[in-house]
Amino acid sequence: MATKAKQDFGPVRAAALVGVVLAGGEGRRMGPGVLKPLRLLGDRPMVAHVVERLRPQVMDLVVVANDPLPGLRALKVPIIADPPDLQRAARREGRRLGPLAGILAGMEWARRHHPHAGWILTAPADVPFLPLDLTVRLCGLMHVPEPDVLMVRREHTLAVWSVKLAADLRRAILQEGMRRVEEFARRHRLAELAWPGGGAPFLNINTPEELSAASRRLAPARPRSRR
């Protein structure tokens, strides 16, 4: 079992979280065209819905994307990339980095800009119906001894992470070639949240058909005609 990260911060609080939206996925199943996070859902890009729902739940917010397209800059939040040394290593190996690199980028950004925060909350850019009480529910998992990771069960990128894990995460990616989020999380103290009522709020949009279904869900119900 890996050595557990030492915690120097106080208990995680919703107001002390830095939000990190992971917008680096290629979205190949969506087909050619606009990158998946920028596909329109209603009249706005999918990622804009995630930012809107996550912003009130955190103290600050950043989007991780290696290509800062104008559609992302229009969100008016900081756009950061995966750490450069990780990108170079991935090119040498001919492998994709995956979401762990984005999580590390968020941790390192939070440590530079909010050194007393201690925690980040990650969310993928393709979950536009993100619950408005996600932070409160995840922080409710805190107990003694404190977990290092608070995660929604079966939704591994929806999680609260201690930034103290950054050094170990960097080693795991660079030295071990680790890519699976759950594998890294289970090395540390992990608490999982079984979302009440199932996973409906965490609809991941990966295909044009799922995007169409999400658009129908987003549309306001039409009033029934009277006869």
Language model features by range: what are they?
Residues 1-9, 222-227:
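Short Lys/Arg-rich cationic patches that frequently serve as NLS/NoLS or arginine-rich RNA/DNA-binding motifs
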Residues 9-178, 183-201, 208-209, 215-221:
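Nucleotide and nucleotide-moiety/phosphate-recognizing core
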